[in-house]
């Protein structure tokens, strides 16, 4: 469903932001 897709994108987005902040990419 669209909701599950958005949730997955949100998880990926948060992971990417945390990666950038921590500079541990």
Swiss-Prot record:
Keywords: Amphibian defense peptide, Antibiotic, Antimicrobial, Disulfide bond, Fungicide, Secreted
Entry GO CC: extracellular region
GO biological process terms on file: defense response to bacterium; defense response to fungus; killing of cells of another organism
SS bond partners: 19-25
Compartment(s): Secreted
Source species of the chain: Aquarana catesbeiana
UniProt-recorded name of the protein: Ranatuerin-1
Similarity remark: Belongs to the frog skin active peptide (FSAP) family. Ranatuerin subfamily.
Primary location: secreted
Tissue note: Expressed by the skin glands.
Organism domain of life: Eukaryota
InterPro entries: Antimicrobial_frog_2 (IPR012521)
Function field: Antibacterial activity against Gram-positive bacterium S.aureus (MIC=50 uM) and Gram-negative bacterium E.coli (MIC=2 uM). Has activity against C.albicans (MIC=70 uM). Shows no detectable hemolytic activity towards human erythrocytes.
Pfam hit, one: Antimicrobial_2
């Amino acid at each position: 469903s669209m909701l599950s897709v958005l949730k997955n994108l949100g998880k990926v987005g948060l992971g990417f932001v945390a990666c950038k902040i921590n500079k541990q990419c």
